[in-house]
Amino acid sequence: MIEFDNLTYLHGKPQGTGLLKANPEDFVVVEDLGFEPDGEGEHILVRILKNGCNTRFVADALAKFLKIHAREVSFAGQKDKHAVTEQWLCARVPGKEMPDLSAFQLEGCQVLEYVRHKRKLRLGALKGNAFTLVLREVSNRDDVEQRLIDICVKGVPNYFGAQRFGIGGSNLQGALRWAQTNTPVRDRNKRSFWLSAARSALFNQIVAERLKKADVNQVVDGDALQLAGRGSWFVATTEELAELQRRVNDKELMITAALPGSGEWGTQREALAFEQAAVAAETELQALLVREKVEAARRAMLLYPQQLSWNWWDDVTVEIRFWLPAGSFATSVVRELINTTGDYAHIAE
């Protein structure tokens, strides 16, 4: 299995280094739900601004304040502890008057607004995230500048970030131990983290191998293509390759890679043979996903940061802004720009 740091680059390995997250204010994330709260209902959506505390910790504190069970507080996604992040929590408080959440106090956390909503906010139920990053001590401004220009046109590999695999790869290691021993894992969080790490690692491997051996944007017979921004996909045939290639070049269609699991992967013929060969050595992880009935799915191989802009504060400091759809990783953008240094180079987003 290829480690995250050794995955193939789209724009070649960066020539320079830089410091990511010199302080939490250098990594700002604003969650974009993609919908407006209902203004009524048995749930309360709470928009918070936090710094120095993780999402689960804040959710548990909110549950305690509201005197409800922790499972009654949900969120769309985990946000990094070592960053300034704005996100929504959702508390189920039926048949009660609206509580005064301005009285909720937690160090490093501030309630920005709260409003009634009809439905529970479920994991993954967000449109995306807006990022503002500051890279410091950049050693090669010209290289970073050119890479930013190239990323605007060609995007970056849509890798799952190192944080998906846990500190030091602990989640992937747990998945491997589980696969090898077949010992039941009763902790639901561990099961979820480990299965997610296993499938993500296989996806990364497929994308890395495709980058090594071919133009990642070149449609081949049997590729599974999806409309940009959509989840559905269809299979490319030789008769359609020229037209499909034009649509891929226009970013109307995206070539996908497998998220392996049970059931058909989605590709056929040449593309399927390539994907199977790319992860042929990882039989234990594949068997684990099938055994645990994790359904195979597809994910775009390339990621195009939207609204990408940057501003050099000086020759060694650059502020970068962009928006990514849900499930994408800002660190997968940064790794195409610089070799990161610092304690938080690979801490979870």
UniProtKB/Swiss-Prot annotation:
The keyword Transferase does not apply. Keywords: Isomerase, tRNA processing. Gene3D superfamilies: TruD, catalytic domain (3.30.2350.20), TruD, insertion domain (3.30.2340.10). CDD domains: PseudoU_synth_EcTruD (cd02575). InterPro entries: PsdUridine_synth_cat_dom_sf, PsdUridine_synth_TruD, PsdUridine_synth_TruD_CS, PsdUridine_synth_TruD_insert, TruD_catalytic, TruD_insert_sf, TruD_pseudoU_synthase. It is an enzyme of class 5 (isomerase). GO terms for molecular function: RNA binding; tRNA pseudouridine(13) synthase activity. It comes from the Bacteria. This is tRNA pseudouridine synthase D. The lineage of its organism: Bacteria, Pseudomonadati, Pseudomonadota, Gammaproteobacteria, Enterobacterales.
